[in-house]
């Protein structure tokens, strides 16, 4: 029976991969030269035809601060002995794989931001949904900010400029108004056209509710306690995924080796190679 299930999985995965079209890797483009940064950045901040459909806005910084404090405190609660169990650990690793590997790395980053490959629309939306469950914002904002970062990496208009220090590039930038969000309507114009992506961008936080309800029910059914699975599957998992993702923006721009000039401070970091979901350009 186990062999049969494995065979069915392999056939299904094989059929999906046949529909994937890998694009020829684009040549590495260096960030905009320093003397042109301000001029080009200002152009991106000007209102575009997509601004009415997706009005640019700045972060509600206090909301971000309170959310981060709450999620980190809850992750500490999850580590209390009474919440440890194999089902809880399994929930963490499963949702880590679903959100960090499939959602952020494969979906938000490789597929939507860089268009490294092409998949059927339903599969693209599945990956985007997994990314939204990571609670790193919806696909429109994530992709727009990432494309902005690649255009102006480690310059004064880069929202997580590593030259401002490890803390700033790791998470400090989120607690200030992010001017780069004004450029999102232009940089994510291809995603704004899709109403499903606009939905994910607006309601990504709410996706945690059905997940929490399912985890609670499973925990109660297994007899390990519903809150154990909820705490490990949501707040603790979010904190783990957050910091591993952020280390790509901070640690790989501060420590490591640069075998060639990329035009910014990005480096190859061996530690991140084994801790991040997969090798990613930063």
Segments predicted by a language model, with ranges:
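Transit-peptide-like, low-complexity N-terminal presequences
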Residues: 18-51
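Membrane-interface helix-loop junction between the first two transmembrane segments
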Residues: 85, 103-119
């Amino acid at each position: 029976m186990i062999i049969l299930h494995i065979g069915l999985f392999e056939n299904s995965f094989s059929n999906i991969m046949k529909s994937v079209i890998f694009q020829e890797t684009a040549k590495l483009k260096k960030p905009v030269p320093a003397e042109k940064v301000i001029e080009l950045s200002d152009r991106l901040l000007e209102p575009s035809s997509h601004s009415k459909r997706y009005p640019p806005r700045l972060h509600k910084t206090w909301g971000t601060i309170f959310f981060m404090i709450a999620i980190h405190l809850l992750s500490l609660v999850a580590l209390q002995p009474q919440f440890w169990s194999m089902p809880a650990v399994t929930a963490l690793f499963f949702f880590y794989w679903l959100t960090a590997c499939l959602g952020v790395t494969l979906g938000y980053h490789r597929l939507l931001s860089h268009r490294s490959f092409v998949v059927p629309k339903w599969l693209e939306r599945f990956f985007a949904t997994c990314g939204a469950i990571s609670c790193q914002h919806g696909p429109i904002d994530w992709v727009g900010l990432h494309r902005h970062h690649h255009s102006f990496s480690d310059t004064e208009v880069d929202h997580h400029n590593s030259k401002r220090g490890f803390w700033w590039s790791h998470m400090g930038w989120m607690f200030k108004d992010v001017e780069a969000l004004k450029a999102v309507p232009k940089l994510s114009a291809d995603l704004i056209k899709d109403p499903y992506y606009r939905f994910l961008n607006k309601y990504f936080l709410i996706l945690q509710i059905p997940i929490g309800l399912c985890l609670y029910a499973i925990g109660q059914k297994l007899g390990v306690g519903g809150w154990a699975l909820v705490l490990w599957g949501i707040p603790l998992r979010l904190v783990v995924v957050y910091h591993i993702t952020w280390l790509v923006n901070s640690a790989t721009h501060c420590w490591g080796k640069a075998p060639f000039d990329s035009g910014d401070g990005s480096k190859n970091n061996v530690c991140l190679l084994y801790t991040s979901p997969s090798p990613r350009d930063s």
